[in-house]
């Protein structure tokens, strides 16, 4: 009887340990759920659209893809291009509706006077720019189209080369410290 009881206890402990290990593995696989195509790591969202998660290429001039893995790209994820010092010019493809937090931040402007991108072309479909999206970059000008709804805190903080930006009347929410450490880049919408 004692032997049966001991076997039952050991079996129950093994089941509990197995379930704990299994659930831990599930959490790890959710974080590692990124796929890769070309120079981009990405995730497929619940609505079957794609978020670009990480750019692993070395090109200096890029156009973000409209499709990856046969699905439409609608977001540039948080930190996707963070500290990519090789970038000089970026064209964000039509269809992108959101640029995540720190997506293009810290392009190396403080480590090398020639580092960092200076040109970016925004899509007409863009609705949201996340916090610190371009913070600490050498970007010189940005033109946002009508339809943009929000710009997060610190989006252009320490963009010392920024000389011109167009923010349309459609913007309903503007974060704090938007231009702290930047020049006088604001241009009224027309």
Stretches with model-predicted labels:
Residues 39-41, 45-48, 57-74, 85-98, ...:
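Structural signature of tandem-repeat unit edges
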Residues 9, 27-28, 127, 139:
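Serine/threonine-rich, low-complexity intrinsically disordered segments
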Residues 18-35:
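Sec-dependent signal peptide cleavage junction
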Residues 78-80, 100-103, 130-133, 152-155, ...:
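Consensus positions within tandem repeat domains that build extended binding/scaffold surfaces
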Residues 4-23:
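Sec-dependent N-terminal signal peptides of Gram-positive bacterial secreted proteins and lipoproteins
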């Amino acid at each position: 009887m004692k032997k049966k009881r001991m076997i039952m206890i050991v079996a129950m402990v093994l089941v509990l340990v197995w379930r704990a290990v299994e659930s831990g593995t599930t959490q790890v696989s959710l974080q590692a759920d990124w796929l890769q195509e070309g120079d981009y790591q990405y995730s497929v969202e619940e609505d079957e659209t794609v978020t670009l998660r990480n750019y692993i290429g070395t090109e200096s001039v890029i156009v973000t893809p409209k499709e990856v893995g046969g699905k439409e790209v609608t977001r540039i994820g948080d930190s996707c291009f963070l500290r990519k010092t090789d970038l000089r010019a970026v064209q964000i493809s039509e269809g992108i509706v959101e640029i995540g937090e720190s997506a293009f931040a810290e392009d190396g402007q403080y480590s090398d006077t020639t580092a960092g991108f200076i040109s970016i072309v925004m899509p007409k479909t863009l609705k949201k720019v996340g916090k610190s999206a371009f913070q600490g970059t050498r970007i010189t000008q940005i033109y946002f189209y009508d339809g943009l709804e929000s710009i997060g805190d610190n989006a252009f903080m320490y963009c010392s080369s920024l000389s011109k930006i167009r923010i349309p009347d459609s913007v309903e929410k503007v974060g704090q410290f938007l231009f702290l450490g930047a020049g006088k880049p604001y241009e009224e919408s027309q």
